[in-house]
A protein has these predicted regions:
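Conserved Walker A/P-loop ATP-binding site and its immediately adjacent core
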Residues: 38-43, 49, 53-79, 106, ...
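Conserved RecA-like ASCE ATPase "motif II neighborhood" in helicase/translocase motors
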Residues: 100-156
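Conserved motor-coupling elements within RecA-like helicase/translocase cores
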Residues: 90-101
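Conserved pre-motif I regulatory segment
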Residues: 1-30
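Post-DEXD/H (motif II) to motif III coupling segment of the RecA-like Helicase ATP-binding lobe
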Residues: 147-197
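Conserved interdomain linker/interface between the two RecA-like ATPase lobes of SF2 helicase motors
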Residues: 179-266
């Protein structure tokens, strides 16, 4: 998939590449939602592999939602011939040069998961040791780093003996002696990736009582989406506006309700 990178994305890749040559272990990539963080990082890894040998990237993701699978799929799509792996692939074949490995760190610490326990097959820690013995070195990317700042996550990171950790977040915490790469939101807006204007609850009735707030808001969203779609068609533009529903962390019940709503409308 050919992608034309925005100027700020190209600069971020150049800044990451330069930061990897400096002695600082921690690199903070601060990027707002909509800046194309995954595009930046996957292209950065691809460029880094081309000029650095015997390297493996470990991309750690938090929690539920299969973020590691989504990120892997994006790299497969963005970077032709990329060498990506999930945890299951690592447990089968270990680490190899130029691997980009996408791992949900909580799966390694979850009770009942034997990935970090002795077993008949070579376990996860032994795969790391074998890679290090073979002369491979690991570079770490911590996605949504503000959610990964836990003792258990740090324990996983330390297993790789990495001299470089890239921590990505829209709201990063402070790290001593870290290199900060900050993508200005105005640069993202200028490139048209996100909008400068946000209209909240346009033409909503005021001071009304509703039986089901979730259904009410989603109904409104669908009506607005159809209005916009119709207007685009009138202008002979084949654009189908997207409805984005932001759900708080650990709100599985709310997520289920939203999914059931869209299924009832034939939207899946």
């Amino acid at each position: 998939m050919d992608i034309t990178l925005a100027n700020f994305q190209l600069k971020a890749i150049a800044d990451l590449t330069a930061a990897m040559k400096k002695p600082n272990r921690d690199i903070i990539l601060k990027s707002c939602t909509g800046s194309g963080k995954t595009i930046i990082l996957t292209h950065f890894m691809d460029e880094y592999f081309k000029s650095n040998h015997k390297k493996v990237f470990i991309w750690l993701t938090p929690g539920k939602g299969n973020l590691e699978e989504q990120s892997k799929e994006k790299m497969d799509r963005y970077i032709h011939g990329s060498q990506t792996k999930l945890l299951s692939d690592i447990m089968t074949s270990g680490f190899e040069e130029n691997d980009a490995c996408f791992i949900n760190w909580e799966k390694l610490t979850k009770k009942g998961n034997n990935a970090l326990k002795d077993s008949e097959r070579t376990n996860f820690i032994e795969h790391i040791r074998n890679a290090l013995d073979d002369g491979l070195t690991f570079k770490i990317i911590v996605d949504e780093s503000h959610q990964n700042d836990t003792i258990k996550a740090d324990d996983i990171i330390e297993l790789f003996h990495s001299d470089k950790i890239i921590r990505c977040s829209a709201t990063p915490k402070n790290y001593k002696n870290a290199i900060l790469i900050d993508i200005p939101e105005e640069d993202v807006i200028a490139e048209g990736l996100i909008k400068k204007l946000l209209i909240i609850n346009e033409n909503f009735e005021q001071h009304i009582s509703v039986d089901d707030q979730i259904t009410y808001l989603l109904d409104k969203a669908i009506v607005k989406q159809r209005e916009l779609h119709s207007e685009y068609l009138n202008r002979k533009a084949d654009i189908n506006p997207l409805i984005i529903v932001q759900i708080p962390n650990k709100s599985d019940a709310l997520l289920d309700r939203v999914e059931e709503y869209f299924e009832s409308k034939g939207i899946t």
